[in-house]
């Protein structure tokens, strides 16, 4: 609500300053996190986003643009709470490696999340002899989030193709500059093999490949993001660095000058107000005075 955002404004401004972003960007993240996952501790939300942005190539400006739609898709996919938020932040960082651009990564993630609980995906899994809804529900009851459970189910479908397994092994040791091409080749194989039968959307498929084949990195992103939210203050650390820059000190000086000027005007304003009221009264009582004053100006 507007009242909640108003209460969070100091934290929003602090997070924006610490990350070199705008208050509007962080307000969008705060609103989306609250609306979709019920996350009402904005300090924690901001710390997790800041940490994720520091660890990977999907930065705060990208989150402000992509998270509102992604968080809605994450909610529909069954991701919940701060652990679900951490999974989403980590997934974005992994997705950059296969997409090449942050916009592409964001779209791949949205499409993947939308596919997890879609009717057409459930129908495709049924053709493979797998009850998608039932399997995801059982996994959640055991404490496995839906993204992890979905990945395990897709693995069952694609594990039979030796070409995919060979490329998967190659991707683990390949330098980052070669990974995008490898993932593209994997996608071509996957589309013709089992995985293409349950993930027919190309962008969703690329999002999945990023998640599955960058799984170790995804896990590191997620655990680091969660840990710093519980024990650290990434926003505070950034703020410490920002506060030492010349531009920040200049902004503080200008703000202090403006504040001092405002305080001085607050003291003078009552006197100016009384003077204005007196002049207005004279002009009202003696109209010729106004003409004389105007002629003398």
Model segments located where?
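Low-complexity, glycine/alanine-rich, low-charge segments that are largely flexible
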Residues: 270-297
């Amino acid at each position: 609500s507007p009242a909640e955002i108003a209460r969070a404004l100091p934290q929003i401004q602090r997070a924006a300053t610490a990350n070199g972003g705008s208050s509007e960007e962080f307000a969008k993240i705060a609103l989306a996190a609250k609306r979709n996952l019920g996350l009402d501790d904005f300090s924690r939300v901001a710390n997790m986003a800041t940490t994720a942005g520091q660890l990977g190539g999907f930065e705060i400006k990208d989150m402000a643009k992509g998270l509102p739609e992604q968080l809605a898709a994450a909610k529909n996919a069954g991701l919940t709470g701060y652990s679900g938020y951490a999974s989403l932040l980590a997934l974005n960082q992994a997705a950059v490696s296969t997409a090449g651009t942050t916009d592409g990564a964001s779209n791949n993630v949205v499409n993947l999340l939308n596919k997890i609980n879609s009717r057409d995906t459930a129908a495709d899994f049924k053709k493979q002899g797998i009850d998608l809804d039932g399997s995801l529900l059982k996994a959640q009851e055991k404490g496995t989030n839906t993204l992890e459970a979905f990945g395990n189910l897709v693995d069952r479908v694609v594990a039979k193709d030796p070409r995919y397994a060979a490329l998967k092994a190659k991707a683990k040791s390949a330098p980052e500059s070669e990974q995008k091409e490898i993932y593209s080749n994997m996608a071509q194989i996957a589309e013709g093999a089992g995985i293409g039968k349950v993930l027919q959307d190309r962008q969703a498929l690329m999002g999945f490949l990023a998640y599955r084949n960058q799984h170790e990195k995804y896990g590191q992103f997620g655990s680091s993001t969660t840990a710093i939210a519980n024990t650290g203050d990434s926003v505070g650390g950034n703020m410490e660095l920002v506060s030492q820059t010349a531009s920040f000190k200049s902004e503080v000086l200008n703000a202090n000058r403006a504040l001092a000027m405002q305080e001085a005007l607050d003291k003078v304003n009552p006197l100016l107000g009384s003077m204005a009221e007196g002049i207005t009264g004279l002009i009202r009582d003696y109209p010729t005075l106004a003409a004389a004053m105007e002629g003398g100006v």
